[in-house]
A protein has these predicted regions:
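Pyridoxal 5′-phosphate
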Residues: 1-408
Length: 408
């Protein structure tokens, strides 16, 4: 079990009053808060080692380069990549998925298909729309059954026409965790390249890209107690060798002639310009922090919170929860609506009680269209949340229901 009270002391932002109430932060699927150790690591870099990497031979540059590449090795171990050549630093999951879709444009042709699901974040939809538009390939969707991915639908649509399968490991709306290992095996049987959006799984569970046999895996630092503006793209070396750089300029070149240029070896051929050194160091520090807690313990804690709060939410008359009712399939995300109350009004009412949740379409408009709802509220949990936070959410929802009684 986690010592949550000790963990909370590492996050000073949580110790504040919002609208005369103690803050209950339940918007972790959007971004997580940062522990002091991460803030100190970033400050330490700027205070002591601020210099460009891979370029200078002076002491600060050497220290900065060593820290930056040590961060890459930390990430490699965290996801069990086979080599640091397979770990690329990006601006975040969105950038990572765009890079893979750009690679797909080099492979796809008319008559080919890309298979995604209706539960995807826009960042795992729009890049594929563009890739298909440019190449004449077809974008095919897998739909839902009982609030989870319809595996029968997936099997039926996973033919040899499919060249790429790109799915969320965990939905940022439904909270459902997809059986990625099984899906990857099915994708590889038809020769498809498997791409996984790990933005909502990497912060919450142990990831082993080799065990899952993923071809590409993307995630962001800010959703796992790390800084904003830093993310990771893991790719199997054989595909990264085939993949053309997406950005060009300093740092990624081997040699430049008047009419041509050659690239550095992996992973640096993809990292043009001055990288986010402080972000990489901050992310590696966040990884170290999470690993000291233990990713199995992180997952177990969130499962305990969901098991505690889910039936309490179900008991609220007029509250609709989206996604599978099988809690074994769920992560720490719960999307809901309360009667006909607009989710923005609901979120505002909860904020009056000090409870921070998300409201809107959660960058998943095709999913909400499929569910036939314009928007929803969403509560999402992390390592510093408690059962008391769950109780406060339920109590705030009951107060909101009573306040708006008779209006929905």
């Amino acid at each position: 079990m986690l010592d949550v009270e000790a963990i909370r002391k590492d996050f000073p932002i949580l110790d504040q009053i919002v609208n005369d109430e103690p803050l209950v932060y339940l918007d972790n699927a959007a971004t997580t808060q940062k522990p002091l150790v991460v803030l100190k690591a970033i400050n330490s870099y700027y205070e002591q080692d601020n210099a460009n990497v891979h370029r200078g031979v002076h002491t600060l540059a050497e220290r900065a380069t060593a820290s930056y590449e040590a961060a890459r090795e930390t990430i490699r171990k965290f996801i069990n990549a086979g080599s640091t050549k397979e770990v690329l630093f990006t601006r975040g999951t969105t950038t990572s998925l765009n890079w893979v879709a750009r690679f797909a444009e080099e492979i796809l042709a008319e008559g080919d298909q890309v298979l995604i699901s209706v539960m995807e974040h826009h960042s795992n939809i729009i890049p594929w729309q563009e890739a298909c538009r440019k190449t004449g390939a077809e974008l095919v969707y897998v739909y839902l059954k009982d609030g989870a991915l319809d595996m029968e639908d997936l099997r039926a649509k996973l033919t040899d026409k499919v060249k790429f399968v790109s799915l969320a490991h965990a939905s940022n709306v439904l909270g459902v965790v997809n059986p990625i290992k099984e899906i990857t095996q099915l994708a590889h049987q038809v020769g498809a390249i498997m791409v996984v959006d790990g933005a909502q799984s990497t912060p919450h569970m142990k990831i082993d890209v080799q065990d899952l046999d993923l071809d590409f895996f993307a995630f962001s630092g800010h959703k796992m107690a790390g800084p904003t503006g830093i993310g990771v793209l893991y790719g199997k070396e054989k595909y990264l060798e085939q993949m053309s750089p997406v950005e060009f300029g300093g740092e990624m070149i081997d040699f430049v002639y008047e009419q041509s240029a050659s690239w550095k070896e992996l992973p640096w051929k993809f990292e043009a310009g001055t990288p986010n050194m402080a972000g990489a160091i901050g992310l590696a520090t966040a990884v170290d922090y999470l690993e000291k807690i233990g990713m199995d313990a992180v997952e177990a804690h969130e499962q305990e919170l969901i098991a505690y709060v889910y039936p309490k939410l179900q008991a609220i008359e007029g509250l609709t929860i989206y996604g599978s009712q099988d809690l074994a399939q769920r992560s720490g995300v719960i999307a809901f609506n309360l009667g006909d109350l607009h989710p923005h009004d609901l979120a505002t009412a909860l904020d009056y009680e000090g409870v921070a949740v998300r409201a809107g379409h959660h960058c998943a408009q095709p999913l909400l269209q499929y569910l036939e709802v314009p928007a929803s509220a969403r509560a999402s949990f992390y390592i510093y949340n408690t059962k008391a936070d769950c109780d406060k959410l339920v109590d705030a929802l009951q107060k909101t229901k009573e306040f708006f009684n008779g209006t929905f």
